[in-house]
Structures are given as C-alpha cells and as structure tokens.
C-alpha cells in the first residue's frame, strides 16, 4: 500500500479541487497511459487495485509507472459518535487528482494489450479516464 513514510502534520484540511492539473499531463516514461477527466480523491487502495488489475492482465510483461502518490491523510470518526469533540483519527491516504493528470503509464506491450489493461484499471477508479499515447515530436519520441 502506498503512503508517506512520515508527515509533518497528522491531520489536514480537505482543500478545494478547482481547475486542471498543473503538471504530469503528458506521457513521459511509458508509451501509453490513462488520463483523468474529472477531479477526485483516489485512495491508496484504489491505486493498488488498479495496479494489480493491470499487471495481472499483462502477465508480468511490460513495465508500469504509477504517476500519482497518496500524500494526503483523511480522517473519520467512529460510528455512532456525537458531533464535536475534535477531528477524527486518520483513516487512510488519498491522492488529489485533477482533470488532465496522467495516472498510470505502461510500456513494453502492444497497444491492444495496453488498452485492455488500462481499461481494467480504470474500472477500479472512481473517475472517468481517457486512454492516451505518447506524443512524438518531429518523428522522434520525446526521450532525453
């Protein structure tokens, strides 16, 4: 499960999810990826479920990059507890995802396999996603 090793503060404000993603909007490491179409919180369990779905379909072939990291803690109060008396205990970790952010990248497999693997992964996520390919500039891939 993905989570930070240590954090400065155990509890965080929820924050706003306005606008589009600032960075990470293009496929850089792999050949194919899925891009978020909506904004949402994605939990570390959803990320792990999507990763397992992809790698199982690819039969351990190819390489997968996870481009998001759950660095934001969310809290919850126990069931049947009255309002007030402080903020709840940390419950889990989420990644804040905005539209345009590339979530996962794949390389080393054919486009058909990548499309299906990423489709299976997208079913594990709470947002609409879109399949994207690496854009080639001037006939060459943008690798440095």
UniProtKB/Swiss-Prot annotation:
GO terms for biological process: translation. Pfam families: Ribosomal_L16. Transmembrane segments: none annotated. This is Large ribosomal subunit protein uL16. Binds 23S rRNA and is also seen to make contacts with the A and possibly P site tRNAs. Part of the 50S ribosomal subunit. The gene is rplP. It comes from Bacillus licheniformis (strain ATCC 14580 / DSM 13 / JCM 2505 / CCUG 7422 / NBRC 12200 / NCIMB 9375 / NCTC 10341 / NRRL NRS-1264 / Gibson 46). Keywords: Ribonucleoprotein, Ribosomal protein, RNA-binding, rRNA-binding, tRNA-binding. The keyword Cytoplasm does not apply. GO terms for cellular component: cytosolic large ribosomal subunit. PROSITE patterns: RIBOSOMAL_L16_1, RIBOSOMAL_L16_2. Belongs to the universal ribosomal protein uL16 family. InterPro entries: Ribosomal_uL16, Ribosomal_uL16_bact-type, Ribosomal_uL16_CS, Ribosomal_uL16_dom, Ribosomal_uL16_sf. GO terms for molecular function: rRNA binding; structural constituent of ribosome; tRNA binding.
């Amino acid at each position: 499960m993905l989570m930070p090793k240590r954090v400065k503060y155990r509890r965080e404000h929820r924050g706003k999810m306005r606008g589009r993603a600032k960075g990470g909007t293009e496929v850089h490491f792999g050949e194919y990826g899925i891009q978020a179409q909506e904004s949402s919180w994605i939990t570390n369990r959803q990320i792990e479920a999507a990763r397992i779905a992809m790698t199982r379909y690819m039969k351990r072939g190819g390489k997968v990059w996870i481009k998001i990291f759950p660095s934001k803690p969310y809290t919850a109060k126990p069931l049947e507890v009255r309002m007030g008396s402080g903020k709840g205990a940390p419950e889990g970790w989420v990644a804040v995802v905005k539209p345009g952010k590339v979530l996962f990248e794949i390389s080393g497999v054919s486009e058909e396999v990548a499309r299906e693997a990423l489709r299976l992964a997208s079913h594990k996520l709470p947002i609409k996603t879109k399949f994207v390919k690496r854009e080639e500039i001037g006939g060459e891939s943008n690798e440095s």
